[in-house]
Amino acid sequence: MSNVQNASRSSAFAAVEGDHWVESLDDGRHVLIRPLREEDRERERQFINRLSPATRHFRFLGEIKEASPALLDQLMDIDYQQSMAFVALVHEDGELREVGISRYAACCEEGQCECAVTIADDYQGLGLDAVLMRHLIDVARRNGFRQMYSVDSAANRAMRDLCCALGFVGQRDPDDSTQVIHRLAL
């Protein structure tokens, strides 16, 4: 990588404070990964609203047209221990745009957390899902979780492939044959 590219990449994310990482995608583009913050609420709303209907369906296992205030309240409610989220941002037209997010939330069974990852349609297939999930898995381990799981549509091939690559084991949901439960021992 040239010094001009390095300088450009560094300056795009120069004002970021706190824990963060600049990661390379499979096509050479860079994204900023950091914990979700309250200031990201509008970005999260725009991110969800820009997703294709198919991507929204895979993420929420149902039809939603846009992010309601109640949904945003739920998604933004993280405490960095029992619930965590990492956001992927790109510098675009002078603004930071959300292009992906991974999250977990503790479950009623001790030591378990449910996870999800969502990638903007124009950033799918570039390895961003794996980057976000690796950060999420590391934090879940550090926070004492012993198992992570995800409930996904059986038709979501990308999630099935990602989970397999990360070491999750999948099985059909015994309560809903259209869904798969992927589990990872932490």
Curated annotation (Swiss-Prot):
InterPro entries associated with the record: Acyl_CoA_acyltransferase, GNAT_dom
Record's keyword terms, sorted: Acyltransferase, Transferase
Domain N-acetyltransferase: 31-186
Cystine crosslinks: none
One GO MF term: acyltransferase activity, transferring groups other than amino-acyl groups
EC number: 2.3.1.-
PROSITE patterns for this protein: GNAT (PS51186)
Main enzyme class: transferase
Pfam families: Acetyltransf_1
Binding-site positions, CoA: V117, T118, I119, G125, N156, D161, L162, C163
Function: Catalyzes the transfer of an acetyl group from acetyl coenzyme A (AcCoA) to an acceptor substrate and releases both CoA and the acetylated product. It prefers the antibiotic chloramphenicol.
Protein name per UniProt: Acetyltransferase PA5475
Annotated source species: Pseudomonas aeruginosa (strain ATCC 15692 / DSM 22644 / CIP 104116 / JCM 14847 / LMG 12228 / 1C / PRS 101 / PAO1)
